Amino acid sequence: MLLLLLPTLALPVALGFSRIGSLLAGAPVAWLVASQSFRLPLELVMHRAASDGAMPPQMTFTGSNFDIVTGATAIVVAALAAWGRAPRWLLLSWNALGTALLVVILVIAVASLPAIGAFGHQPARLNTWVAYFPYVWLPAGLVSAAVLGHVLLWRRLLQRGMRGRALSPLS
């Protein structure tokens, strides 16, 4: 399962810094932020899975995963960006928080693997559910999408000429 982590992180980072990533980073900032809103319903589904005993509780917002904040605030921050009312400091802060929360859940997921078992070795505390279909799409697709989204927004916000510049609604 640890082998899933390398492509989950390396591929979206490589794509984010490629020519295609340059094109994608040129999308309106509001779109780049809004793309992270999928994390809100995802966290609700994960909470339900934990309530049903299908995944470890530490990987939900009732445990140690507060990634739901990124999904919920993406909607508000994207709307502010679309209206031209999201100051650059807000976008930088939001992306830093979202990136940090993503790193936290990645650490929790790895620490919950059977080989590590940092949260205990009881079956309910072990992260084995992502090895089964359709849950394998969580690390393979959705985590990669979240990583790519943050890389693209960082690239956009830190590109030359954008520093210190106010963002117009469609910039």
Q: Which residues are covered by each model-predicted region?
A:
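Hydrophobic alpha-helical membrane-insertion segments
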Residues: 93-108
